[in-house]
């Protein structure tokens, strides 16, 4: 386990646009933490010509707002977690758990590995309305695929600060697709997951409606970093 951390796994929960990925990226600036974005791992599979065709077919539906099947989530996430732990790092999951059944599946996995008491769950809480606003205004780099979180200042940018590529609106961030994502991944569906984790583990809730830097400070406080 990473030095000075009481956790082996940190799970970031939040509806689309909550900023959970951004917060995980900020923590990952510490080399002892590995950011596991299932969304990015899925996109990597989608662009890999050697990937399982069946897996790629399911990922095509994900682009339309549908959920990825549980087996594929487990397959990708469990492998990434084990690789991080082998290296003595803290595994930070972003976007992996989208249903109550998946939450139970992950909990069973953690219990089998004997690390259930070493898992922290951080909920980045925002409203469905704010989710819609943020998602329709965030951009992605056409070159390095860096996702630029929404802010009035960021929305005006056209060039990626990371690599100089062109910033575009994501294909799956168009209004009709976003609305479907909120209908299937919004607070109505997240609430039972959060309540489940309150019963079985360590859950911390942070107000995600504030600025990125303020949320980052709160996350570090609750994780005692």
List the predicted regions and their residue ranges:
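P-loop (Walker A) phosphate-binding loop of NTP-binding proteins
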Residues: 15
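Post-Walker A helix-loop "phosphate-sensing" segment adjacent to the P-loop in P-loop NTPases
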Residues: 28-37
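Conserved phosphate-donor/acceptor-positioning beta-strand/loop module used by diverse small-molecule
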Residues: 94, 114-138, 149-162
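Cys/His-coordinated zinc-binding microdomains
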Residues: 145, 164-167
């Amino acid at each position: 386990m990473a030095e000075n951390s009481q956790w082996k796994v940190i799970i970031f929960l939040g509806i689309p646009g909550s900023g959970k990925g951004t917060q995980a990226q900020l923590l990952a600036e510490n080399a002892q933490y590995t950011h596991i974005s299932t969304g990015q791992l899925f996109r990597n599979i989608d662009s890999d010509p050697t990937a399982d065709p069946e897996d790629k077919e399911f990922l095509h539906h994900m682009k339309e707002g549908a959920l990825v099947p549980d087996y594929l989530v487990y397959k990708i996430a469990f492998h990434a977690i084990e690789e991080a732990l082998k290296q003595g790092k803290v595994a930070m999951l972003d976007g992996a758990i989208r249903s109550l059944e998946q939450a139970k599946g992950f909990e069973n996995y953690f219990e089998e590995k004997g690390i259930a008491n070493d898992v922290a769950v951080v909920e980045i809480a925002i409203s469905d309305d704010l989710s819609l606003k943020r998602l329709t205004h965030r951009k992605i780099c056409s070159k390095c695929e860096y996702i630029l979180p929404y802010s009035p200042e960021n929305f005006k940018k056209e060039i990626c600060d990371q690599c100089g590529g062109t910033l575009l609106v994501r294909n799956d961030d168009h209004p009709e697709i976003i609305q479907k994502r909120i209908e299937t991944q919004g607070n109505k569906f997240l609430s039972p997951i959060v309540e489940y984790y309150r019963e079985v583990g360590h859950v911390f809730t942070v107000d995600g409606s504030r600025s990125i830097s303020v949320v980052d400070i709160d996350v570090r406080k609750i994780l005692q970093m």
